[in-house]
Regions:
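A residue-level marker of the well-folded mature domains of exported/periplasmic proteins
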Residues: 2-5, 10-11, 21, 29-327
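Cleavable N-terminal signal peptides
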Residues: 15-16, 26
Length: 327
């Protein structure tokens, strides 16, 4: 090869390499969002079978209406497969951005990646996806929600203090594979593991559902009549557990303590009634924070990988004062 040809080849190779690197860097970033007065956005809800989800949906719809945005809303009815299809439908409809509350961490990865490929930014709200498979700032913009691990930790710490570090515990888990179920279990279980006088004798999913929580609690109470505590990953299952305890001829709040998460109105009423010991808040009113994040992102502002909500803790000392503000 002549000197001239070699030089020309090297220049071409450098240029090609720069183009490839540029493309790789561009693909390593989450899709951009153009600045507009109004947006057409999608909200892919996971289900609508409990007060928490209904409150979240109401907040997202109300804030979109307030801003004058067009909202494409879908309800996956508890199906990860349908939620993936819902996101694909939003992509086909040409939405500007997608707000996704993933039912489970792994099955919703294809939906996130499909939106990225289509150039549509995704904002995860309430629930997260598997962090080993998708990254904030690269595959989606950010996660907006509560610190589920901290929620579980707070529930565990309250229980240690209340029981003096002695308890036989039944755990009612949320939807299998979901980030709140995974993290609320970890946060709580880690606290219990540090207290030798406390033992989790059974842990089973109640799918965040009141009636399923009741059924699972009934079964586990029969298998473990020595249980003194039920930890539920949400108030709906805790309320189901109250019914199960009463059906077993025991007194909730006395014979068996219950601690849970969410802070819904029925949960706070159960605290007032002395049946539920405490509930860690997980605020469902995401509308203002979700849309504010999108507006800031469009303006080019730096969005953190996680936008963590500030939640409260409810027990007998404040439930009566706070119930009017609950959902």
């Amino acid at each position: 090869m002549s000197h001239f040809s070699r030089r020309k080849f090297l220049k071409s190779a450098v240029a090609t390499g720069a183009m490839v690197l540029s493309a790789q860097l561009a693909f390593a970033e989450a899709p951009k969002l153009a600045v507009k007065a109004k947006y057409k956005v999608g909200f892919a809800q996971t289900e609508s079978n409990n007060p928490w989800r209904l409150a979240q949906t109401a907040s997202m719809k109300a804030e979109a209406e307030k801003l004058g945005w067009q909202l494409v809303y879908t309800d996956a009815a508890g199906s990860a497969a349908k939620q993936v299809a819902d996101v694909n439908s939003m992509i086909a409809q040409g939405v500007d951005a997608i707000f996704l509350s993933p039912r489970e961490e792994k099955p919703l990865i294809p939906a996130v990646m499909a939106a990225k490929k289509a150039g549509i930014p995704v904002f995860l709200i309430d629930r997260n996806v598997d962090q080993t498979l998708a990254k904030a700032g690269e595959d989606y913009v950010t996660f907006i929600g509560s610190d589920f691990t901290l929620e579980g930790k707070q529930a565990g710490e309250w229980l240690v203090k209340t029981t003096g570090g002695k308890a036989v515990i039944i755990e009612l888990e949320g939807s299998t594979g979901s980030s709140p179920a995974n993290d609320r279990k970890k946060g709580f279980d880690d606290v219990i593991a540090q207290n030798p006088g406390m033992k989790i004798v059974a842990s089973q999913t109640g799918d965040f559902n009141r009636d399923k929580g009741r059924q699972v609690a009934e079964s586990l109470l029969q298998a473990h009549p020595e249980a003194t505590v039920i930890y539920a990953h949400n108030d709906e299952m805790a309320i189901g557990a109250i019914s199960a305890i009463e059906a077993a001829g025991k007194v909730p709040g006395k014979d068996i303590l219950i601690v849970s998460i969410d802070g819904e109105k029925d949960g706070l009423q159960a605290i007032i009634d002395g049946k539920l010991g405490a509930s860690v808040e997980c605020n469902p009113k995401f509308g203002p924070a979700a849309y504010a994040a999108a507006i800031a992102y469009a303006k080019g502002e730096k969005i953190p990988a996680k936008v963590v909500n500030t939640d409260r803790f409810f027990d007998a000392s404040n439930a009566a004062k706070m119930i009017t503000d609950s959902y």
